Amino acid sequence: MNVYRLASLGVWLLIGLVSTGCSGMPPLDQQKRLVQAGDFRIQQLTPPAFVETWGEPTYTHQQFTHFFGMPDGRLIPQARMALGESPQGWETGLAAGDAFFMAYADRGYYLVFLEGVLVYHEAMTAEKVHLVGKTWKFESQFKTRLESSPGMK
C-alpha cells in the first residue's frame, strides 16, 4: 500500500471515529455487527466499521463529488449515472463535497462516504470493482501535488 493511500485511509478512519463519538451514530461495535450482517444503513456506518470488519479495501479514492439526493436518504454519486441522466425517483435534492470511496473486489462492494458516513453502496462484480479501481488509478495520475496531499484542501 503506498504512503498516500495509507495516509488517506488513516485520515478517513480518524474522521469516522470522531464523527461516531460526536453524533447520534451507533457505536463502532454495533456498526461492525451491521456490516457483518450485510445491513448497510445509510448515514449510520463509517469507514472504520468496514475496515475493522472486512480489512483494507482493494481500492480507495477521494475526490470532490456531486450527488443526487434521494427521498430514502441515499446520495447517488453523479459519476454512477450516464451523462445527462438522473436516477429514477430523484426530484430536486442535490449535495456535493469531498467524498471518500472504498471498493472491495473480494466482497463485490463499492462504498461512498460523505462527511465520514456511508451515503451510497452498490454491489458489483469483482471485475467491475477492478475496472473502477483502474479508472481511479488513471485519474490520480493527473492530480496536482496539492490535490494529492492529505490535509491540503
What are these language model-derived features?
Residues S23-K153:
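Residues within mature, well-folded domains
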